[in-house]
Amino acid sequence: MSHLVKMENGQSQTIQEMLGCIERYNPDHLKTLEAYVQDQAKNNTYDLEANLAVLKLYQFNPHMLNFDITYTILLKSLTSLPHTDFVMAKCLLLPQQMKDENVQTIIDLADILERADFTLFWQRAEVNRSMFRHIAGFHDSIRKFVSHVVGTTFQTIRKDLLKELLGGIEDSTLESWIKRNGWKHQGQGLVVVAMQDDKIKTKNITEKIEFDNVGGLMAQCL
């Protein structure tokens, strides 16, 4: 859905155009930006700059604070891990937002993800599933982050452990994630995450430098 922002002169701008000028701080545009946040949740899209602009407008206009939009922005920023979007969003929160129980729950979920305690995350996510039910693709976005961590941590991993880290998914769903990441079955319940030949190999390079090559440079430094 295309969101247009109505200017005082009667003309319209796209949200991206509006964010590039001083109009991004105009509270008259907040409702349009909030609707844009809701569309991101519904359509599995993401616009960090617009979402941060909403939080900044809340800072300037605390009386216009919308907690539901705040939750959605924070949860959408989690779907961007391992990028630092959540940290940036968190830094813009007002004291009353930080004191909110749901905000604290989301912050706890973020901490758990950053510690890579994925089993605990899925347990907490199940308890709080109503919080992000409206965010399309949320679970798969987190699984993408889990896959990133697994890919940088393991060479091989037990199939049952991988299934647990991805949220206790069905075998058919696990197979699709294995295929998506280019992993392979090894047998004996193991999944090959990274072949040894795929690992970057270090190489020592020795370069012989003659004194005549650097003598002039050293003389200039004296």
Swiss-Prot record:
Pfam families: CSN8_PSD8_EIF3K. One of its GO terms (molecular function) is RNA binding. GO terms for biological process: formation of cytoplasmic translation initiation complex; regulation of translational initiation. Residues 46-208 form the PCI domain. Component of the eukaryotic translation initiation factor 3 (eIF-3) complex, which is involved in protein synthesis of a specialized repertoire of mRNAs and, together with other initiation factors, stimulates binding of mRNA and methionyl-tRNAi to the 40S ribosome. The eIF-3 complex specifically targets and initiates translation of a subset of mRNAs involved in cell proliferation. Its main location: cytoplasm. Keywords: Cytoplasm, Initiation factor, Protein biosynthesis. SUPFAM superfamilies: ARM repeat, Winged helix' DNA-binding domain. This is Eukaryotic translation initiation factor 3 subunit K. It is found in: Cytoplasm. GO terms for cellular component: eukaryotic 43S preinitiation complex; eukaryotic 48S preinitiation complex; eukaryotic translation initiation factor 3 complex. The lineage of its organism: Eukaryota, Metazoa, Ecdysozoa, Arthropoda, Hexapoda. The keyword Cytoplasm applies. Component of the eukaryotic translation initiation factor 3 (eIF-3) complex. The eIF-3 complex interacts with pix. It comes from Drosophila yakuba. Belongs to the eIF-3 subunit K family.
